Amino acid sequence: LDYLVGTRGSIFSAEKTRPDFHEPTGFNIDVCREVRGALPTTPVFLQGSVVDWGQAEWALGDGVCDAVEMTRAQIADPDLVSKLSADAAHTIRPCIRCNQTCQVRDARSPVVTCVGEPTSGRETEDPDWYAHTARARNVLVVGGGIAGLEAARVAAVRGHRVRLVERTHQLGGIAALAGPGAPLVQWLIGGCTAAGVAVEMGTERVAPRPDDVVI
């Protein structure tokens, strides 16, 4: 026996095998502890909603397991491991466990991707979203929901001069009101700040005239 993976659920309770945000993260930690106690010499893998690298590090350090599976976390940010190695954990895009586009049990066999990282799963067919532009333009993004924040962030990372206007006094749109979506909203806001996006809230003013408008 090479190793054991502690899991829950079956074909009759598939929601327990890969649950969304309604279940706690790392919900199989207790299973791994029991397996470790019964088979102390067999390597144990922790699986089940481990999307926070800090929790994974704790589980390894506390002896809960020998390895951790973080599938959805690496769909949300395929560079998770390299960012940790580069001491850039603060730049890791969070998985909010929404299970919207990363489910594998679908007879239609769709691309496994992520609502928070739309390039994930399409690396071989999409152009490089982050290729630096040879000619910077003035870009106006109208709307500070998660789509607007991502558009503004990517445009700024590519070297454009970006201004984002939001009619309300809060960024993130509906996602900011839903508890599970808050970490992604905060990550996007931080990314826009780091990239130099000029954000204006409580306004519908679009002047001066930009070169490009994203609505």
Predicted segment positions?
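Phosphate-binding active sites in nucleotide-utilizing proteins
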Residues: 137-215
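Flavin-dependent oxidoreductase catalytic cores
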Residues: 1-142, 146, 150-162, 170
